[in-house]
């Protein structure tokens, strides 16, 4: 009923805020790896750049990271870097034709083997799973490229080292495409040797997030944390949920993860098509209840790889991901290899703003009660203060919330209760600044020390007024701790009114 009541009040003429609370993750590829392209993505709205380690060498990714940091320096804006592992997945090999793809036609026969040294043709391709012949059976399927290409298994010829398949649909097969064997028992390690090398490379490069592919259970996350070691202890792990086992074990995975990605591409192949939205809503809602960031990904604006405008369905999909509660929405091929990368980021930001406007029309008391009810018990002092800071901001029609937070926990707890206003998160820890770029509504603000609350608040208000986040007469809610600069001691809530000058504040 709360949704119905909200929707009945909607209008196309409602003015839109200039501030986008939902964060945008952009995959960087050949079209956008240059410093100039990265600067344009940052200025258009990118918050997190994703490096897909299913493709590219360490030298390539190292150059991209160097370019990202140079672009940050030139724009004066901070961007987080996410290393997305290849994971224990199966992929196709190289193609013989110089164009890098072959056309397949419905009804034709094609052989599938595991000889990755031999380039594929329209009659024979390879995949990198050595256990293929022991895992599949006649009557099963091999699904390629997020299930776009479907092959029916007609024979398993172990003595010849290949599987005979029939092509079920006209399609174009490229190199290094993901492969699924639905219904087959696939024995793959949680973390491959390549993943270990890539994660260690990420530690050396000081990346901010590891997006861990094909997480199936909590132990998979713990294994990655061990690989990160002491040197990589500040790198956060975003667990990608992309198979049925990951969905079944989601509660234990969420508990040990720093955040979650709903990787709908592979998940959509493993889960029945009509059930994908159920999985998405369940995962996002559980992340919201836990106060952990969640990214909705895959095919969000897919048509913009080739077209300057998204489909109506895609625009609605992005909006619904925001309304579901996503902290971030992600672009993949749209920005990695598409013809309209900047337009894709721009339209995604516009859709997010509109969806946030709709969300802010929801009866807040109903939302607040639901979030309180779903929170783990007992509730911490920090969460109690954070939740009532948001409730106070709503009641007083405040324009801004300021949190003083070392680890970012207080800011995430405030964000959990979904205020419709910006959250300036003041911290003296540089990695916290990067991590908060995946938290909805958070604007990280780096300072030398959290000692001296009043001066920090003055600095924040100067920044906020400069960026039109508040004005004279605005009410501002401050969340901090009596023990200044001590992590985990959030226990104080204040309300200030911005006066004639920054220093003219009323408590």
From Swiss-Prot:
Protein name, UniProt field: Pyruvate kinase
Binding site for ATP: 52-55, 91, 177
Family named by the database record: Belongs to the pyruvate kinase family.
Reaction catalyzed: pyruvate + ATP = phosphoenolpyruvate + ADP + H(+)
E.C. designation(s): 2.7.1.40
Record: residues binding Mg(2+): 242, 266
Domain of life assignment: Eukaryota
Binding site for substrate: 50, 265-266, 298
GO molecular function, one term: magnesium ion binding
Annotated source species: Dictyostelium discoideum
Subunit-structure text: Homotetramer.
Gene name of the record: pyk
GO CC annotation: cytoplasm
Pathway, per record: Carbohydrate degradation; glycolysis; pyruvate from D-glyceraldehyde 3-phosphate: step 5/5
């Amino acid at each position: 009923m709360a949704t119905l009541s909200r929707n009945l009040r909607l209008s196309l003429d409602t003015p839109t805020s200039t501030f986008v609370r939902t964060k945008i993750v952009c995959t960087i590829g050949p079209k956008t790896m240059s410093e100039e392209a990265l600067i344009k993505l940052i200025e258009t709205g990118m918050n997190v750049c994703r490096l897909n380690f299913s493709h590219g060498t360490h030298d390539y990714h190292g150059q991209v990271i160097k370019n990202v940091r140079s672009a940050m320096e030139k724009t004066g804006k901070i961007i987080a870097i996410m290393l997305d592992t290849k994971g224990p997945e199966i992929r196709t090999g190289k193609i013989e034709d110089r164009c890098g793809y072959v056309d397949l036609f419905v009804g034709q026969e094609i052989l599938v083997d595991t000889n990755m040294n031999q380039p594929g043709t329209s009659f024979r391709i390879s995949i990198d799973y050595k256990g293929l012949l022991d895992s599949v059976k006649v009557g099963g399927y091999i699904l390629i490229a997020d299930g776009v290409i479907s092959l029916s298994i007609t024979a398993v010829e172990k003595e010849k080292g290949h599987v005979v398949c029939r092509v079920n649909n006209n399609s174009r097969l490229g190199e290094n495409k993901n492969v699924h064997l639905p219904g087959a028992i696939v024995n793959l390690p949680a973390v491959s040797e390549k993943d270990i090398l890539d994660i260690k490379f990420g530690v050396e490069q000081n990346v901010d997030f590891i997006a861990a592919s094909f997480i199936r259970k909590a132990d998979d996350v713990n294994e990655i944390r061990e690989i990160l070691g002491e040197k990589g202890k500040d790198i956060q792990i975003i667990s990608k949920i992309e198979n049925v086992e990951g969905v079944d074990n989601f509660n234990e995975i969420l508990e040990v993860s720093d955040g979650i990605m709903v990787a709908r591409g592979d998940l959509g192949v493993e889960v029945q098509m009509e059930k994908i939205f159920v999985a998405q809503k369940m995962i996002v809602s559980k992340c919201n209840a836990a106060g952990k960031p969640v990214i909705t990904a895959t095919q969000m604006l897919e048509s913009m790889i080739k077209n300057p405008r998204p489909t109506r369905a895609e625009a609605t999909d992005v909006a619904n991901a925001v309304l579901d509660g996503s902290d971030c929405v992600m672009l993949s091929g749209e920005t990695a290899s598409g013809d309209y990368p900047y337009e894709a980021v721009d339209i995604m930001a516009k859709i997010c703003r509109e969806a946030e406007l709709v969300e802010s029309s929801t009866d807040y008391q109903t939302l607040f009660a639901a979030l309180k009810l779903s929170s783990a018990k007992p509730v911490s002092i920090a969460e109690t203060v954070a939740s009532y800071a948001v409730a106070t901001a709503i009641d007083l029609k405040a324009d801004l919330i300021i949190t003083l937070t070392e680890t970012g926990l207080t800011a995430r707890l405030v964000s959990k209760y979904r205020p419709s206003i910006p959250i300036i998160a003041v911290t003296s820890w540089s990695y916290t600044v990067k991590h908060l770029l995946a938290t909805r509504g958070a604007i990280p603000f780096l300072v030398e020390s959290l000692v001296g609350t009043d001066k920090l608040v003055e600095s924040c208000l100067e920044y906020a007024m400069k960026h039109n986040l508040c004005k004279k007469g605005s009410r501002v809610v401050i969340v901090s701790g009596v023990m200044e600069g001590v992590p985990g001691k959030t226990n104080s809530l204040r309300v200030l009114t911005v006066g004639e000058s920054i220093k003219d504040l009323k408590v």
